[in-house]
From Swiss-Prot:
UniProt family annotation: In the N-terminal section; belongs to the glutamate--cysteine ligase type 1 family. Type 2 subfamily.
Catalysed reaction, written as an equation: L-cysteine + L-glutamate + ATP = gamma-L-glutamyl-L-cysteine + ADP + phosphate + H(+); gamma-L-glutamyl-L-cysteine + glycine + ATP = glutathione + ADP + phosphate + H(+)
Organism this protein belongs to: Streptococcus agalactiae serotype V (strain ATCC BAA-611 / 2603 V/R)
Signal peptide range: none
Keywords: ATP-binding, Glutathione biosynthesis, Ligase, Magnesium, Manganese, Metal-binding, Multifunctional enzyme, Nucleotide-binding
Name of the protein in question: Glutathione biosynthesis bifunctional protein GshAB
Binding residues for Mg(2+) 1: D696, E717
A GO MF label: glutathione synthase activity
Length: 750
């Protein structure tokens, strides 16, 4: 079977970049007040380690392992890792942060508690590692990079090879990649090594100078020297590994800490028949200059590097070559961070192969830029990660830098707690739900990002969610009924719930003729089936014919049918009902500022806009307050300008409408709202058959309990997909977390 020079013989349109990616990040939890390894147990907020697909513990209780799902491209893998890191950083105790370096801070054996896992084998395995290698070495952290070649790519190469058996071909291809990785991994150690020092008493021998990567040297986490596994063929590899376990040299196959692992089966013998499906590359130190420990550019450069390894011919003396390459890697790992690659390192072979891959397959200029960056780092070691890290070392210690950098990333995680890193372009309620999904260990897939459509599953239990709370729990007809204001009104009227008096019109002339019945009454004119307050005109006293006619025309521009209803005096509240229980109540107040007798209105607006919850284009729970034409007209009607200095305590209205989208305030009144109104809202949602419902009630005096006789509350609208984030992150009040309750209802077994 011919494996070498397959890429050279491939056509330029081969899907060479097609691959699947997975990243694993290890990080220690650090107790900020003491700046030592945290002694607290694994956070209960992170669900159960028995099944959590994204957040586990590695060797010790404080060492988190963050695991991305399989990603179809490198960008998605980085996106996953950003989100999982964000969730982990905000789920640990608030006085803890994740250590950004591979080498731990000062730590003693007694500070390291073995992960308290329920699986007896996993716990006993860690006890064995303690006896065999010691606890301290287990506290080193890193990044594991998983890559599987794309199926179309594998099929094309298989056909080109004219091999007889697809699994044998796939195994040989992955074995070649593994062999060449072990021959050339020293370049990655040079570029990305980031463990230059160990803190006091960590190593048995003392280092006099910083090095490039302790973790990737013989001083790092490696097997004992008597462990020898051949890479000559897959069969030799399997036999040697099985014999090492049988002889007691290894307690299990996974104790073999090779820089590259064959993956796809739990037992290595299965690879012979079922095939290797991907490889795990374990040589990456945490990059402390990235909040997630690795950068997009690194992931893509490594991908190009791996393709170059397929371009390079195999070795005819692989075990001997790997032995020599290991010595070279150790030399580079223990060299000074500003020392260039040694002369015996065949770096030109790698650079030429990477260049050939770029040219042969017409890769985008992005990959050429990545290669140029590699070339610059080869010429200038100070540009490598270890080279940049060198100036951060103080007295052969990185503790101060690690503490500072870890705190920066901790603060960054909490900077916008309503957003999920990596998914900021999605609707806020969906981001909040995804945070909870990752935190609790529910598997997820974004089926359609534009449509906010998610697939969630745990074991065989699958749920589909749209826009954060539209699920199978609601009958299909329910949102259709609530989207139609006339249908909603009729259903509520039949159940004797209070709704505004009014009528529906599909003809402009008929709507105009209705004026005689309402000309002396306060009214609201609105489209029949619209949202976000579009096309609505409010007349708090009464309307003249000209104004009424204009309001009709505005409403008809939004819908083919309109409603003319009585205007109800009072305060509007949004009630959030979930499965018959009102769990949140919100008061929305129009954009405003309150005078302090010192600042102008313009300055007061700027001060209020400093609230981190305020932003633009619905990317934050609250919108920035503008001072445009509408707001300035409103000020003029009150006798103010933007330069006026209102007296202390004077409330200045900047808008009439209370929409959050136009700078309004959200005020959580859940705990103070009279329970009779909560019950009323819940009963209205139940009457509609709604699992999730936003109920808008006008209440003249919320301090008085609701009475059916007095009907001192009126429902003006029901919403089938109510926003959730505005209940959680409010201008005032404690806020109510809704998405965790949605998730708990969907997956009660968790």
């Amino acid at each position: 079977m011919i494996i070498d020079r397959l890429l050279q013989r491939s056509h330029s349109h081969l899907p060479i970049l097609q691959a699947t990616f997975g990243l694993e990040r290890e990080s220690l939890r650090i107790h900020q007040p003491t700046q030592r390894v945290a002694q607290t147990p694994h956070p209960k907020t992170l669900g159960s380690r028995n099944y959590h697909p994204y957040i586990q513990t590695d060797y010790s209780e404080p060492q988190l392992e963050l695991i991305t799902p399989i990603a179809k491209d490198s960008q998605e893998a980085i996106r996953f890792l950003k989100a999982i890191s964000d969730v982990a950083g905000r789920s640990i105790n608030h006085d803890e942060y994740l250590w950004p370096l591979s080498m731990p801070p000062k730590v003693r054996e007694e500070d390291i508690q073995i992960a308290q896992l329920e699986d007896a084998f996993e716990y006993d395995y860690r006890k064995y590692l303690e006896k065999t290698y010691g606890k301290l070495i287990q506290s080193i952290s890193g990044i594991h990079y998983n890559l599987g070649l794309g199926q179309e790519l594998l099929t094309s190469l298989f056909e080109l090879s004219q091999a007889d058996n697809a699994i044998d071909f796939q195994n040989q291809l992955y074995m070649k990649l593994s062999q060449n990785f072990l021959r050339y991994r020293w370049l990655l150690t040079y570029l990305y090594g980031a463990s230059p020092v160990a803190e006091e008493d960590f190593l048995d021998q003392k280092l006099n100078n910083p090095v490039r990567s302790l973790r990737n040297s013989h001083l790092g986490y490696v097997n004992h020297k008597d462990i020898r596994i051949s890479y000559t063929s897959l069969k030799d590899y399997v036999n040697d590994l099985e014999n090492a376990v049988k002889s007691g040299q290894l307690i299990a196959e996974k104790e073999f800490y090779s820089p590259v692992r064959l993956r796809g089966s739990k037992a290595c013998r299965n690879y012979l028949e079922k095939g290797i499906t991907y490889l795990e590359f374990r040589t990456f130190d945490l990059n402390p200059f990235s909040p997630i420990g690795i950068t997009q550019e690194t992931v893509d450069t490594v991908h190009l590097f791996l393709l170059a390894l397929l371009w390079i011919d195999s070795s005819s003396h692989i075990d001997q070559d790997i032995k020599e390459a290991n010595r070279l890697n150790d030399l580079i790992a223990l060299s000074h961070p500003l020392e260039k690659l040694p002369n015996q390192a065949p770096v030109s072979d790698l650079v030429d192969a990477m260049q050939s891959v770029i040219q042969h397959f017409n890769l985008s200029p992005y990959y050429q830029d990545l290669l140029e960056s590699v070339k610059r780092q080869i010429q200038s070691p100070e540009l490598t990660v270890a080279g940049q890290l060198l100036e951060m070392i103080e007295g052969l210690s990185l503790e101060t830098f690690g503490q500072r950098q870890g705190q920066i990333y901790h603060d960054y995680a909490w900077e916008a707690p309503y957003a999920l890193k990596g998914y900021e372009t999605m609707e806020l309620s969906t981001q909040l739900l995804l945070f909870d999904v990752i935190q609790k260990g529910v598997n997820f897939e974004v089926l359609d990002e534009q449509d906010q459509f998610l697939k969630l599953w745990h074991n065989s239990h699958i749920e589909y969610v749209k826009n954060g709370n539209m699920t199978s729990k609601d009958n299909y007809i329910v949102p259709l009924a609530m989207a139609n204001k006339v249908v909603t009104k009729k259903i509520l009227d039949e159940k004797h719930f209070p709704t505004p008096f009014g009528d529906e019109f599909t003809d402009r002339k008929e709507a105009l003729n209705y004026f005689s019945q309402i000309q002396d009454k306060p009214i609201v004119v609105k489209p029949k089936s619209t949202n976000f307050g579009l096309g609505i005109s409010i007349f708090k006293t009464s309307a003249n014919l000209a104004s009424y006619e204009k309001a009709i025309d505005i409403a008809f521009t939004e819908d083919s049918a309109i409603l003319v209803e009585e205007y109800i005096e009072g305060t509007e509240y949004r009630f959030f009902v979930l499965e018959g229980d009102c769990i949140a109540v919100l008061l929305r107040v129009a954009a405003n500022v309150v005078g302090d007798g010192i600042h102008t209105i313009s300055q007061l607006v700027k001060l209020k806009n400093q609230n981190p919850l305020r932003g633009y284009d619905h990317r934050s729970p609250l919108e920035v307050i503008e001072l445009g034409e509408v707001e300035q007209l409103m000020l003029e009607q009150q006798g103010y300008t933007v330069n006026s200095i209102p007296p202390e305590g004077t409330k200045i209205e900047l808008r009439r409408n209370s929409n959050i989208s136009t700078g309004g305030d959200s005020i959580d009144v859940t705990n103070t709202m009279d329970p009779t109104y909560k019950q009323l809202a819940a009963e209205m949602a139940e009457a509609m058959g709604a699992w999730v419902c936003g109920v808008d009630l006008i209440i003249p005096n919320a301090t008085q309990a609701y009475s059916k006789d007095k009907k001192n509350a009126t429902c003006i609208e029901l919403n089938f997909n109510p926003l959730m984030y505005m209940h959680t992150y409010c201008q005032e009040g404690p806020g109510q977390s809704i998405t965790p309750r949605i998730l708990a209802k969907l997956f009660p077994e968790l």
